[in-house]
UniProtKB/Swiss-Prot annotation:
Keywords: DNA-directed RNA polymerase, Nucleotidyltransferase, Transcription, Transferase. This is DNA-directed RNA polymerase subunit alpha. DNA-dependent RNA polymerase catalyzes the transcription of DNA into RNA using the four ribonucleoside triphosphates as substrates. Residues 1-235 are annotated as: Alpha N-terminal domain (alpha-NTD). GO terms for biological process: DNA-templated transcription.
Amino acid sequence: MQNSIMDFLRPRLVDIEQISATHTKVTLEPLERGFGHTLGNALRRILLSSMPGCAVTEVEIDGVLHEYSTKEGVQEDVLEILLNLKALAVKVYGKDETLLTLHKSGIGSITAADIIHDGDVEIIKPQHVICHLTDENASIKMRIKVQRGRGYIPASSRVHLEEDSRPIGCLLVDACYSPINRISYNVEAARVEQRTDLDKLVIEMETNGTIDPEEAIRRAATILAEQLEAFVDLRDIREPEFKEEKPEFEPILLRPVDDLELTVRSANCLKAEAIHYIGDLVQRTEVELLKTPNLGKKSLTEIKDVLASRSLSLGMRLENWPPSSILDE
């Protein structure tokens, strides 16, 4: 219910129809006009592209070197076997990848129930057919690599990345990680009191059984909400640039006059005038220094030459001298 004309209607879940264990229809209303397509399309795209899942990515079949081979005693060719494995619905708990094995001989069909796995793996449809053996002496042995991921990654995009480390006979499979087999949405008319221009969103979805349809919709809505959080509070989130602070005084000015290695006579004259740092010295003029007892023109020339060798001179003006670091001492 709206409190004012400026408020937006808040939708609510009206109905969740469980058609089967993997097929669900969800109805959401009322939505403001146009919001049905806005939300429906966004959720549909996220459900198709961003739901995590598990998929077969690599297969090794004894006696098979490439996907265009055939195996004696097996009804299907290798390409068809790979397509059947691509459609395998499997869940892996606690790790990102695992290796399954399959070894069967004798006439009969080979299904997902024949796959050997540990307790961290769950085969959703054990009746899923992988291939058929047509000869009593026929046998097939394979190793199946299953990985966790998101979206769809074709085998062609991984060929160059894994070419050096991939052993001969290791067949790459297009990885379809998405647990969503089919999803569609429909926008119908809805009504609230006198308003008849509202939307009703109906989402119909089928999964491969590795995820509950309701959980998939909740997860997609969470992803959408998290991606939109940045727009709720728009601000500059760039890292602040830290500029290196330039020291208030050149380091040489903070050094004691003893570092100038003056003669003993000149050094003693400066200390008698309480000139302890080079910064104290450069602020004095020639006239001021000549008034210092026992400091003559020879000592003055020595001081000027030593300062000049360090790109300094007498009569310099230093604002805010002395610095607090010297005062604290």
